[in-house]
Design a protein with these regions (language model features):
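Primarily extracytoplasmic ectodomains and periplasmic/lumenal surface modules that are beta-strand-rich
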Residues: 40, 46-51, 58, 119-120
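A low-complexity, Ser/Thr/Gly/Pro-enriched, surface-exposed linker/loop concept
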Residues: 49-100, 127, 132-140
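Short, exposed beta-strand-loop hairpins at the edges of beta-sheets
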Residues: 112-114, 119-131
Length: 140
């Protein structure tokens, strides 16, 4: 009887780290994240991912006539549809947001983002998305 309890305890202690790892893997992603440089901040809410680039030198398309606020520094992406620039008078910048290290992925509902030293690349399941850095903006 003692041997059986000892085996169960040993098995439980052996499996405990694996269970903890599995639980961590299934936690929802943080709703907000930033690049290690702090130049790009992203937030997911209401089915939309928005990323703001604080400082950029990339070329932006002409400002729409109805846009009277900041243009070219904010990009949005939903699980369906194409990425788009956003005319924004606010920001999603949060200096306390999770830092998505270079080489790490953010796996949100229907959208995946990769953080690299060259910037952030986000895409939805349909293959639409964007790649952005201080010097480059590509919508695809």
């Amino acid at each position: 009887m003692m041997l059986s309890a000892s085996i169960r305890l040993s098995a439980a202690l052996f499996l405990l780290p694996f269970v903890a790892s599995a639980q961590q893997a299934f936690q929802p992603p943080p709703p907000a994240f930033q690049t290690p440089s702090g130049n790009i901040h992203c937030r997911f809410g209401a089915g939309t991912l928005r990323c703001d680039v604080a400082e950029h030198s990339y070329a932006v398309p002409p400002r729409p006539r109805d846009c009277t606020q900041n243009w070219g520094g904010s990009i949005t992406l939903r699980a369906q549809g194409e990425a788009a620039l956003l005319c924004a008078g606010d920001t999603v910048r949060d200096d306390e947001a999770f830092v998505l290290g270079y080489g790490a992925d953010w796996l949100g509902p229907g959208i995946n983002c990769d953080s690299e030293e060259s910037g952030i690349r986000c895409a939805n399941r349909a293959g639409h998305g964007f790649q952005v850095s201080r010097t480059k903006l590509e919508l695809f």
